[in-house]
Amino acid sequence: MQFKDEHPPYAWAGVAAAVLLAIYVATLSPTTAFWDTSEYIAAAKVLGIPHPPGNPLFTVVAHTWGLIPWAADYAVRINLFAAVTSALASGLWFLVSERWMRGIVPARWPRYAAAFAGVLAAGTAWTVWNQSVVNEKVYTLSMLSVALVVWLAVHWGDAEPGPARDRWLILVGYVLALTSTNHLMGVLGAPAVAVYVLWTEPKVILKPWAPLLGWFLTIAVFNHLPDLAHPGAGPTEMLVTVVTLALIVYAIWRDPKDQLAYLAVGAVLVGISLNYVYLPIRAAQYPPINEGEPIGFLSQALSDVLNRVQYGKPSLMDRQAPFYYQMATFLEYFGWQWARNWKAFAGIATGLFAFLGFSGLFGLWRSDRRAAYAAIALLGTLSVALVFYMNFKYGFSIAWDKFGNNVPREVRERDYFFMGAFAVWGVCAGLGIAVWMRTIADFTTRAGTAPARWAISTPLLALAIIPFFGNRATASRAHETVARDLAVDMLQSVAPYGILITAGDNDTFPLWFAQEVLGVRTDVTLANLSLMNTDWHLRQIKRRETPDFDATDALPYWKDRIKAGDVPGEAPGGGITKPTNPVFQWSIPQLDSMADLTPVAKDQKVTWDSLQITINGSYIPQGNGYYLEKSDLATLMLIHDNLGKRPIYFSITDAFHPDQVFGLRPYLVAEGLARRLYPAPVKPGPNIVTSPYIGYIDVNATDKLIWDVYHYQAVTRKRPFGWVDPPSGSILTVYGLIYASMAQVYAEKGDSAKARKAEQVYEGIAAQMPANGPR
């Protein structure tokens, strides 16, 4: 190719990365956020193991990154890690884009400008930007991996044939193996690499090292390496072993001295080692976050974590929603990317960028077929193939007017899975801008010199800033602190050495963050209703040693309550007596033996002292009876083992689960965001009143919490489009529930000033509800 010898513009790629990084830093989240953000930041801090597949590459790299004091706040450091990895990906996309444009725009500076326009559009696409300013997921690291392997393939395609060039492919294999230990999204650049290899030098696949590299990479990425340890276990294990031995024999037969063959196998094994070496070693040290407990190098627990068995996904042939609705959800997300905040103009912007992207692909097809097919393979893998593979339920908001909640839906929007597709489409839009710049330059031949003709076409570059201005109001995470504040507020609602039973991700992961990263109220034991259906979470609760409650460093709220003798377990001379009983009386083997479902009688009664529990089990037709889930049985055990020994609380976020399943409403009293369980039926009085919203309320405790402790200003903060993420908006309603309830209490007590103040907080929260934001 005529432009092959032109050196890659690494310096300008660095400039492009720096510009995107500046945008991300300016809109960076100052702390944690909802969903998986808190889990990943906390896991990085304690070198823990987050949810399957464990993401060891992220944990190790982010932990190392977090040791460097880039910022005083640890969460900001990890959020900055997301920003840097995304910006580096933009720099690599600049290199790829510039190389692909060489047959479209022969003039260097217009080409650089068009390549920059593409990466600016890609980097400010709504999902890419939103995920680059907070470490909600591990996908910015995966996107960096995709960009890297594509650039390595492009670079390999321009290199001279020979052993030196072959080493680039082995490097690609290493990167693919390594990034698979972060997330499988990172390997989705492989089809583009395959296009480059088969188009440029198809004979390379017959070299002895190449089949070994491809095969070992395949069995490593898809977690079949352990099959080699027990070849007789089944047909799959036998097949993996036979093919592996055959390829080794073939490589030795062809050239026993071929160093590249050994290098290829070694590269894959070293790259994948974080999965098979690091995970079991670290799990055996029982870090505070140890999801799945994948202890043992060839253990079933490790296999289950790597294969995500916990989630129980159905076969790809068993679609969780019709494929056309799954694609419709993807297209809905695509429509968010280019000007999400400009509601009236968003559709036009989507059409414009769709047109530019297709123009870019067509122009690339005309100028560089190899690159065009690679781009198509990459886009197809990151979009249609990924939609098919992920097999999601109906999107959270797709076809809501038609189906409402009458179809199985995802619990949240899943646009982040497709951020790679949106970034690559932004690059293609940059190619489209280059195509139309070339068209204008060719059309204006009478305008004089070539620089003058290119100058006439430069206004097209302004199209690339549309996503920046169209997305910045909601893609930005600057000033958003609700997740951190909720966690701190909820923990501070719990008495010293209390047990707090929570419901799901958004009311649990922030608590992990608050305890492990901020060091807030580590004396509180956390139990999650959803996670208590797993063995590992019950073991984690059992093993956890309760840190001391430092009364001297407590909030004034708790100092006052301790001084007034209003806290269980008060020790003589002040302070709080630390409980000595284990949270679970059962041993770990006994906890492991708990069945997933336990049969119970309909409305079965259980009485402990003055506490009477009415168990409302779920009727399961297959079992012809009523059953209690493992998590509910574990909850009963927590109550039985700790009632009168440790304060027990249920979070307000649990949707009144203990009321419905155990009939505990007469025993629960709200103290702000948490409801304390009492050992006997509660009697209303001057300080204990009834609210139609949440049942009994401790007025004095809640009054002090909501005005002296809680960060309600963070919730009522005005946002240009309200709370953007509807699925997590229920967290705001929890605050609203408390303040609305207290407004009623104040009104009934004749305190009109506080009633109005609480109403104003509620109204401020209601104004931010998801219905007011874009979807």
For each feature predicted by the language model, list its residue ranges.
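Extracytoplasmic catalytic/substrate-binding loops of multi-pass membrane glycan-assembly enzymes
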Residues: 28-40, 50-62, 76, 290-295, ...
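ER/secretory pathway lumenal C-terminal domains and tails of membrane proteins involved
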Residues: 2-3, 99-104, 117, 133-143, ...
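Phosphate- and divalent-cation-binding pockets in alpha/beta enzyme and binding domains
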Residues: 60, 509-513
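Alpha-helical transmembrane segments of multi-pass membrane proteins
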Residues: 21-31, 384-391
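N-terminal membrane topogenic signal
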Residues: 2-15, 110
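Loop-to-helix entry region of an early transmembrane alpha helix in multi-pass inner-membrane enzymes
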Residues: 56, 68-91, 95-96, 108, ...
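Hydrophobic alpha-helical transmembrane segments of multi-pass membrane proteins
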Residues: 48, 80-84, 345-348, 424
